[in-house]
Amino acid sequence: SLVQFEMMIMEVAKRSGLLWYSA
């Protein structure tokens, strides 16, 4: 689902220390 995808993106962003994803 879209929500699950967004959650995954946020996880990756946190672990990589990037803030390229913001909603």
Swiss-Prot record:
Its EC number is 3.1.1.4. Binds 1 Ca(2+) ion. Belongs to the phospholipase A2 family. Group II subfamily. D49 sub-subfamily. The keyword Magnesium does not apply. The subspecies C.h.atricaudatus mentioned in PubMed:20347857 is currently considered invalid. However, since different origins of specimens explain sequence variations, the specimen origins are indicated under strain in the reference section (in PubMed:20347857, South Carolina to C.h.atricaudatus). It is found in: Secreted. It catalyses: a 1,2-diacyl-sn-glycero-3-phosphocholine + H2O = a 1-acyl-sn-glycero-3-phosphocholine + a fatty acid + H(+). Its cofactor is Ca(2+). Expressed by the venom gland. Snake venom phospholipase A2 (PLA2) that shows high lipolytic (1048 umol/mg/min) and weak ADP-induced platelet aggregation activities. Also shows weak anticoagulant activity (IC(50) is less than 1.0 uM). PLA2 catalyzes the calcium-dependent hydrolysis of the 2-acyl groups in 3-sn-phosphoglycerides. This is Acidic phospholipase CHA-E6a. Contains 7 disulfide bonds. It comes from the Eukaryota. Keywords: Blood coagulation cascade inhibiting toxin, Calcium, Disulfide bond, Hemostasis impairing toxin, Hydrolase, Lipid degradation, Lipid metabolism, Metal-binding, Platelet aggregation inhibiting toxin, Secreted, Toxin. GO terms for biological process: lipid catabolic process. The keyword Lyase does not apply. One of its GO terms (molecular function) is metal ion binding. One of its GO terms (cellular component) is extracellular region.
